[in-house]
UniProtKB/Swiss-Prot annotation:
Disulfide bonds join 100-113, 116-129, 119-137. Residues 1-44, 74-96 are annotated as: Disordered. The lineage of its organism: Eukaryota, Metazoa, Ecdysozoa, Arthropoda, Hexapoda. The gene is wgn. 'wengen' is named after a village at the foot of the Eiger mountain after which the TNF gene egr is named. This is Tumor necrosis factor receptor superfamily member wgn. Induction: Down-regulated by bacterial infection in the gut. Keywords: Apoptosis, Cell membrane, Coiled coil, Cytoplasmic vesicle, Disulfide bond, Membrane, Neurogenesis, Receptor, Signal, Transmembrane, Transmembrane helix.
Amino acid sequence: MMPPRLPGGHGGAMRSRSSSSGHHLNTTFHKRRRRRQQHHIGGSHISISHGSYLALLLLSTTCSLVATSASSSSSAANTDIAPPDPPPVSQVSIASSSPCAPQHWWDSQRDRCTPCTRCQGEMIPLRPCQLHTDTICGSIYDLKIDWVVLAKTEPNWKERRKSSEYEHFEHNAPLQHLTHEQLQQLHEEAAAAWVLDWQTGVLYVAVLTCLVFFSVAACILIHHMRQWRRMERRLDQDVEELSTKLMAKLAEVQSLDGGTFFIGNADALRGLPASAATTHPATTQSGIFQPQHVLLPEKRGKHQERRILKTLQPGNVYIEESNAGLGGMGVGLGVRGCSGLKG
């Protein structure tokens, strides 16, 4: 606790600071005195708190030691008074006797090793022979088998069977007995499921076969379509070639009989002289024909040409003649073996 201030101490300090230095010294003395008193009070409180803490710690340790000593003495007295439990006879006998040979188990009633029982006939061992128990025989109907789970084709049927077997061995659950009718019903359900699986497999195979057939047919159809297109292109080319040859033959025949016929590039030959027309007959034959209707000369000229062609021998012969019908222009005629006239 801080000591009470003197009345008018704070105001006197303010006045002393403003009026004289004597009052200032007095106030500083009082301040130092107050600080010393505060430090003295705080140190006494700290020393008192540390002392009380140490006293409480010593008291608690002594109480705990007394309690532990009392509990140990009482437990020792109880153990001295109570007699020890006698060990069981079976454990003493087993510990004193030698271990049994293989395929033998210890019979506690007879106090000796006994050969394990062998299952006869259709009986199967439900539980094998162990050190303290004999073999347990039974039929297949005595087994704990979940036929419904076995009939289903699930991915985790093995795990379920293992878990059920472990639960049976751990908890010693009673064996489930299935009647002949129930077993027959389960077999019928399994057969129906097998038939359904077989039908499903056949359906899958049929669908796969159809898909393969249609895919092969589509490939063959596409191949034949390509072949037909190639044949059509070749046929068009052959038809064009035959048409050009036919037009050339028709021109040869009509030039002999009279009338109109077709020649190639007739406009170009109109302005050429007779010598140029005779020197370029092959080019006019092999070039692309541009159909032009040209009137042949009169019948007198045609008869004269026929007479000349009859007297000619086989070969290419070029004849130049000018008459009024042709208008003074030379025409080159090529004859190949008297078979036709090409211009």
